[in-house]
A protein has these predicted regions:
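An intracellular "coupling" helix at the cytosolic face of ABC transporter transmembrane type-1 domains
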Residues: 22, 26-27, 118-119, 135-144, ...
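Helix-to-loop junction immediately C-terminal to a conserved catalytic motif
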Residues: 410
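Transmembrane helices of ABC transporter permease
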Residues: 27-41, 149-200, 271-284
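Membrane-integrated ABC transporters
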Residues: 1-46, 61-76, 90-94, 98, ...
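Cytosolic ends of transmembrane helices, especially the final helix of ABC transmembrane type-1 domains
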Residues: 204, 227, 251, 299-328
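ABC ATPase nucleotide-binding domain helical subdomain, centered on the C-loop/LSGGQ "ABC signature"
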Residues: 107, 325, 349, 421, ...
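ABC-family ATPase nucleotide-binding domain "signature/switch" substructure
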Residues: 437-440, 445, 456, 473-477, ...
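Hydrophobic alpha-helical segments in the permease module
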Residues: 75-87, 180-184, 253-267, 273, ...
């Protein structure tokens, strides 16, 4: 006897910082190289200004006339304008790859998320995933754009400025840089705490986004139950948590940034005291001291920017860790590829066979009946065969396992090996997309998209359907007349989740989406609940007349009366089976539900 828990997604290696950079940033190396050259030019021009200022001061201190330094002053102004032009170009060139990385990584992680299993989405809130794909990727963009820009500025200004300072007076350079070196030690110890607080902040933001998304999706339920105030209070509480974690990061920055400025001031004091002594001794000129102070001023910005860079790096690192949950999760696919054989559509095998299927929602563990289990079995030893063209009904109360069975057949939940077979082949060896193309599954909860009626019916088709195909599908779902009555017909926008349609129209539109695909098997999970008796009767006549195999679950006997046989589901087991006429005598509830 085979038992299976609902399995958690297994992990594979995800994108680390280096791998992410190689995948998304390295292909844009020519943009970064161009930005590198432009920033080098900016900083070289910038470092000429102190030298020109030194010339002006030295000339003026030796009694030169203003006319003697006019040309040098104009050169400084010209270099300033040149810096504006080159710096603007450098920002454009370096920021552009950041946007490209943002766009490419959003597409990558979104595409990756769409291929993940139901287990992943069960353990992650929709709002939290939206936050990861929006806010966290925005943090990566900030680092690979503004962060890279500032990092290059730091490297160039530090190397060039220190080289110029050392060429003037090596010992004074060493003494003036000691206070700035202290800052690197302080930031090194601050980095782990910044990373921890960044993770807490981005996790809290993900929870808040999830709360807000849930509220907007279920706003009618919240209002109908008078829970507006309590939901708002919960959101406010989580918003306060985001604020608290944000303030922790702010406190660290409030400590680091002023300290950087203060230490830069200490460096300038060192230059004034020690440099002044050297001027008095005749080993340095006044112009040299001025140039030194300008260089220290130039170094103040990149060292202050180090705090920004560290903050951006920590937030980007945290973002990549959170996105790594998406990247590491195992996508849908063949679970047993080594035993894969192609389904035989021409054989006399059952179209669908379920063999002693047992299942419980308990990720990561396989238990037997005698072993202690965290959750009860949802399905217990379910077995049946569905032949091509056969129509089977599932009758049972809520919680009897009908929907879970359908989710296992379509591999929304992963079934145990050797329990579900499609055309004689274990479904675990099939690609989920291949399997689902042959099975039309209408879920209890209708899912429509904010688009036109045409787009919703044609959803999932590789080719644009003809008008005749659309009309045939809509007619089969008993909604053609209503579509034609809409002002814009097939192009009518139905709003988010089909808000402009009634409950019955939503169900029939979703059914038309299945019928246009003409799958060999239809799985209908209580899809008639919002229909009146007349529409239900017409729709059932259309479904039974289409041919093909049918597996329909309902708590209304009228929907199952025409099935070849009915399985009675009780507490996850097949309690009985047979034709409607036989079972109705043993189960009066089947007749009462007609």
């Amino acid at each position: 006897m085979k038992k299976q828990d609902h399995q958690a997604s297994t992990k594979s290696a995800g994108l680390g910082f280096g791998a992410f950079t190689k995948k998304f940033a390295l292909p844009l190396w020519h943009w970064y190289a161009s930005g590198f050259l432009l920033l080098a030019a900016v900083n070289l021009v910038n470092l000429q200004i102190p030298q020109l200022a030194k010339i002006i001061i030295n000339k003026l201190t030796t009694g030169a006339d203003l006319s003697d330094v006019r040309g040098v002053a104009l050169a400084i102004v010209g270099l300033g304008f040149l810096m504006i032009i080159i710096r603007s170009l450098s920002r454009i060139v370096i920021f552009w790859p950041g946007r490209r990385i943002e766009s490419a990584s959003k597409s990558y992680f979104f595409s990756r998320a769409l291929r993940l299993t139901e287990a992943f989405f069960t353990s992650h809130g929709m709002g939290d995933l939206i936050s990861r794909l929006a806010n966290d990727i925005a943090q990566l963009r900030a680092f690979y754009a503004f962060g890279v820009l500032q990092l290059l500025n730091v490297v160039f200004l530090t190397v060039f400025a220190v080289a110029r300072m050392a060429s003037v007076h090596l010992l004074l350079t060493v003494c003036s840089l000691i206070p700035l070196g202290v800052m690197f030690v302080i930031t090194r110890f601050a980095m782990p705490r910044m990373h921890t607080f960044s993770r807490e902040n981005q996790d809290a933001l993900g929870i808040l986004t999830n709360r807000v998304t849930e509220a907007f999706v279920n706003v009618h339920v919240i209002q109908a139950n008078g829970a507006t105030a309590s939901f708002a209070a919960r959101a406010a509480e989580q918003n306060a948590a985001v604020l608290r974690t944000s303030l922790r990061l702010v406190y660290i920055r409030m400590f680091i940034f002023p300290l950087m400025t203060c230490l830069a001031g200490v460096s300038q004091l060192v230059v004034l005291f020690y440099g002044g002594h050297e001027v008095i001794a005749g080993r340095l000129s006044v112009g040299d001291i001025l140039a030194f102070n300008v260089y220290i001023g130039l170094l103040t910005f990149p060292l202050s920017a180090m705090g920004i860079i560290l903050a951006l790096y920590q937030r980007a690192r945290t973002a990549l860790e959170r996105l790594g949950d998406i990247d590491r999760a195992k996508p849908e696919g063949r679970l047993d590829p080594e035993s894969h054989t192609a389904p035989d559509s021409a054989s006399a095998l059952p179209l669908l066979e379920v063999r002693r299927l047992s299942f419980r929602f308990d990720p990561g563990h396989t238990t037997s009946k005698t072993a202690p289990a965290q959750t009860p079995l949802v399905l217990d030893e379910v077995s049946f065969k569905l032949m091509p063209g056969e129509r089977i009904g599932l009758f049972g109360s809520i919680g009897s396992g009908k929907s879970t069975l359908f989710n296992l057949i379509t591999r929304i939940y992963e079934p145990p090996a050797g329990t579900i077979f499609w055309r004689g082949v274990d479904v675990r060896t099939l690609e989920p997309t291949q399997l689902r193309r042959e099975i039309g599954y209408a879920l209890q909860q209708v899912h429509l998209f904010s688009d036109s009626i045409r787009a919703n019916i044609a959803f999932g088709l590789s080719l644009e359907p003809s008008l005749a195909e659309l009309e045939a599908a809509a007619h089969g779902a008993q909604i053609l007349t209503e579509i034609q009555a809409f002002g814009q017909g097939w192009e009518t926008e139905i709003g988010e989740r089909g808000v402009r349609l009634s409950g019955g129209q939503k169900q029939r539109l979703a059914l038309a989406r299945l019928l246009i695909r003409k799958p060999p098997l239809l799985l209908l999970d209580d899809v008639l609940s919002a229909l009146d008796q007349v529409t239900e009767k017409k729709l059932l006549e259309s479904i039974y007349a289409r041919g093909g195999s049918l597996l329909i679950a309902s708590h209304r006997g009228s929907a199952l009366a025409r099935c070849d046989r009915i399985l009675i589901m009780e507490s996850g087991r097949v309690a009985d089976q047979g034709p409607f006429e036989v079972l109705v005598e043993r189960y009066p509830s089947l007749d009462c539900a007609t």
